[in-house]
C-alpha cells in the first residue's frame, strides 16, 4: 500500500516516542484515535514492520498491539535521524512513588498505640465483626443436616448429563422404567 511520506513519519514518530502502538481492527476507520492518519495506513505499516521484525504483534479483543523490538529501535533511530541517547518511553525507568520506606531499623517510627503486652494485637479489631455464640451452643453449634435414617444410594447409570453410558441410540438400563 502506498503511504505518504508525511503519514509514514507521523506513525514512526509516535511508535518511537511511545515504544508501543495499537489500532482497532477496523479498516474503514477514517482516523487513528491518537495519530492523525487513516487507521488502515497504521495497520499496513505495522504489518510491514512486523515482517521485517521491527515490531512484535499481539491481537486481542479486536485490537492490534505492536511492541517495538531492538531492531525496530535502531531502524527508527536512523530513519528519524535521532541521537542514540533518545529512547522510547517503554525503555525509560519510571519514577518510584515517594511513599513510605519499606525497610529500616525497627525503632524508626511509631507503630500506633501500645497495648497490654507491649505490642499490637495480632489481628486488630476483627472481633467486632465476628458473630457471637449461636443457638446450639458455643461457636458453630448444632449443625443442620440430613436425618439420621437417611441412606444415600447410587442409582446406577441413568439418563442424565455428564459422562453417561452411550449416546442417543443407547438402550435404557434395565429396571429404569424407561422405554
Swiss-Prot record:
Residues 145-156, 168-179 have a biased composition (Low complexity). GO terms for molecular function: mRNA binding; structural constituent of ribosome. It comes from the Eukaryota. Keywords: Cytoplasm, Ribonucleoprotein, Ribosomal protein. It is found in: Cytoplasm. It holds the Pfam family S10_plectin. The keyword Ribosomal protein applies. Residues 108-129 have a biased composition (Basic and acidic residues). Belongs to the eukaryotic ribosomal protein eS10 family. Residues 134-144, 157-167 have a biased composition (Gly residues). This is Small ribosomal subunit protein eS10x. It comes from Arabidopsis thaliana. Its main location: cytoplasm. One of its GO terms (cellular component) is cytosolic small ribosomal subunit. The gene is RPS10C. Residues 90-179 are annotated as: Disordered. The keyword Transit peptide does not apply.
Amino acid at each position: 500500500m502506498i503511504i505518504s511520506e508525511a503519514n509514514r513519519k507521523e506513525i514512526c514518530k509516535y511508535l518511537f516516542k511511545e515504544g508501543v502502538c495499537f489500532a482497532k481492527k477496523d479498516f474503514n476507520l477514517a482516523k487513528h484515535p491518537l495519530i492523525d492518519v487513516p487507521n488502515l495506513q497504521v495497520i499496513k505499516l505495522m504489518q510491514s514492520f512486523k515482517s521485517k521484525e521491527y515490531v512484535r504483534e499481539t491481537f486481542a479483543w479486536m485490537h492490534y498491539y505492536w511492541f517495538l523490538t531492538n531492531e525496530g529501535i535502531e531502524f527508527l533511530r536512523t530513519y528519524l535521524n535521532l541521537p542514540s541517547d533518545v529512547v522510547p518511553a517503554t525503555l525509560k525507568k519510571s519514577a518510584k512513588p515517594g511513599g513510605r520506606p519499606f525497610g529500616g531499623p525497627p525503632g524508626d517510627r511509631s507503630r500506633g498505640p501500645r497495648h497490654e503486652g507491649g505490642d499490637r494485637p495480632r489481628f486488630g479489631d476483627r472481633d467486632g465483626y465476628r458473630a457471637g455464640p449461636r443457638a446450639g451452643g458455643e461457636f458453630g453449634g448444632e449443625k443442620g443436616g440430613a436425618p439420621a435414617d437417611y441412606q444415600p444410594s447410587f442409582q446406577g447409570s441413568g439418563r442424565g448429563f455428564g459422562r453417561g453410558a452411550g449416546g442417543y441410540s443407547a438402550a435404557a438400563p434395565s429396571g429404569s422404567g424407561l422405554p
